[in-house]
């Protein structure tokens, strides 16, 4: 079973402010995110409550897993679909992913969810879009642990300068 992290960061590893992206949407990054997380159609995306609320909808063609102690499926009776599950812990999420045998599982945020998965040492690789601008942020991606080595670099946009790092 494979777990990967996918994230866009600015200088200082910022990823958000007030539960929103601190930068205007970058089409190239959004397309890359969609392509990677959809994969062969049997992938999951894993997010915390605030990331789910900031997106405001389920992302299609992927199984959406929301980790939250305060949300539960009773809150979303009208919008629960076969492609969505609300779970109360990282451990429950890992067990669920094992049971469902998704091809790939992408951790998509936020800060606490990234940190917990990285601390468990089960993230195989990290796809990081690095935006070479500084933005005000109140949420940050943890420093990439030393066990990861930079594997690939790909330029994806010029203004602002964005590159894809694969760790």
Model-derived segments and spans:
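Enzymes that bind and transform nitrogen-containing heteroaromatic metabolites
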Residues: 1-167
